[in-house]
Amino acid sequence: MTARPRVLVSAYACHPRPEAAHFPGEAILGWSLVDEITRFADVDLITWAFNRPGLEGTFTKSEGRPAAVHYVDLPPRLHRALRDRHYGVRFYYFLWQRQAARFAKGLARSESFDLFHQITFSNDWMPSFIAPALPVPFVWGPIGGGQKVPGELASTLARRDRRRERSRTLLQNVWRATPARRRAARKASAILVCNKETEEVLARWRDKVVAFPVNGIGREAIAADAAPERRGGFRLLYAGRFDPIKGLPLALDALRILRTIAPAVTLELVGEGPERPRLEALAARLGVADGLIWTPWSPRSEIFKKMRQSDVFLFPSLRDGGGAVVVEAMANGLPVVCLDVGGPGFHVREGSGIKVRPGRPDVVAAGLAGALGRFWCDPGLRDRMGREARDRAASYYAWDRLGERLRGIYDDALAGRPPRREERP
């Protein structure tokens, strides 16, 4: 890439302060990637009007990184759809995308662009309505959507949650069969995918598919070294929502097994969510309630401190597409034990943690306990894997490194070349 191209970016979620955003994980992805893109391209950003307070004044020509921000909104009467975190949010985004497509078509009649990139709220089954209308190369993603709860582990969910998962899969398959989705995939010059399940769903377009994480980390958040600040005992940490898909019943059963050889082990659960009463009841039945530390959701800096003081990060999520907290644990020199599914399975590689294959719940719980037991028996393993995890976060997940990779993907798209495939982490 020689001259700065002009890029039209759609990032529905895009905000520099995730705590003030409606969708924190998506918002920081949108903000961070757009921030990196402005280093080598002139950007016109289309985003949701909700982000205006956080974005105004952030991209200015005085910084030498020009960006024009265009806000698109829907009528206030439709905002109530956002209260339903499952279907309402996607329905609202579908309508927003149609509105954004009309705006983009009008903008393209008076402005000239070299490339279009759709970043946030991207998944393999929801098509881009903007891309097919623009006569320029299209970069799609990073996208997820292919991940789903492994069949045998669905039994760990309550009945209502199993019904919801079946409805989710049905809805996705209907969308995948639409002409609009096929048009978007055909139009794309590069499709960035954030987990292996989504890559498999897109096998028909594998020549366009590039592994690219949906999570990153700022340089300031990467620990200077990976040496743990141990406080004694054997401390496990989980941070995130207490939601059905997080697999926490497996974590509690693994703790029960682990305590047969490590009776002093503790598991700190940082977060909140609707599953807590069910988890408390399960912990009492399993006899592990006295080994749990329940901590309300904490500021990011406090969670990072806890990561530095823990031995292992336990994250048995059943179908997370990304898993930003896994990257944050790695950046703080904390090895990860997770299932080999979705985003966590994408992030953790040999040497930076231990992944357990999905299967029957009792077998998976035993596998998690066995992985944790390895760290209990060999403190040096925690140090070695912690260093590898921290180094991997710095070399692959730092936002500036992801920006460099994105620049190469743009180069290929603008030159009409297939994207260069790189090693998945």
Feature-to-residue mapping (PLM):
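A conserved mid-protein helix/loop that constitutes part of the nucleotide-sugar donor-binding site
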Residues: I28, F234, R241-T260, P274-E280
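N-terminal subdomain of nucleotide-sugar transferases
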Residues: M1-A67, A190
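Short alpha-helical donor nucleotide-sugar binding micro-motif in glycosyltransferases
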Residues: W297-S298, K305-S310
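Short hydrophobic beta-strand element within catalytic cores of glycosyltransferases
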Residues: P335-C338
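Aromatic "clamp/platform" in nucleotide-sugar-dependent glycosyltransferases that forms part
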Residues: L318
